[in-house]
A protein has these predicted regions:
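A conserved regulatory-domain signal marking ACT and ACT-like small-molecule sensing domains
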Residues: 1-95
Length: 95
């Protein structure tokens, strides 16, 4: 990650749903198609429920286009997928 990356260039993608194969590959593939770089990824499976949180560098990618792609992927995989800019995410979840 370059020092020039700001929080407005980054976003948090969250995935929640029943565990199944291919979720990580599908999300990563969509991001790669949009030239979005994964900076950090965390995933957990609790009692059959899959959760994943991913920090990405949007670079010059259009967040609305990524949102639309993730929405279609969410429906296809049967999981919930959300994307928020990092600064909005931090504001909403501050303690």
């Amino acid at each position: 990650m370059s020092d020039e990356t700001t929080t407005t260039d980054r976003a948090i993608i969250s995935v929640l749903g029943a565990d199944r194969s291919g979720i990580v590959a599908a999300v990563a593939g969509l991001l790669a198609e949009q030239d979005v770089n994964i900076l950090d990824i965390s995933q957990t499976i609790l009692q059959g429920m899959f959760t994943m949180t991913t920090l990405v560098d949007l670079g010059g990618a259009d967040i609305a286009t990524i949102h639309d792609g993730l929405a279609a992927l969410s429906e296809k995989l049967g999981v919930q997928i959300t994307i928020q800019r990092e600064d909005v995410f931090k504001f909403m979840y501050r303690l």
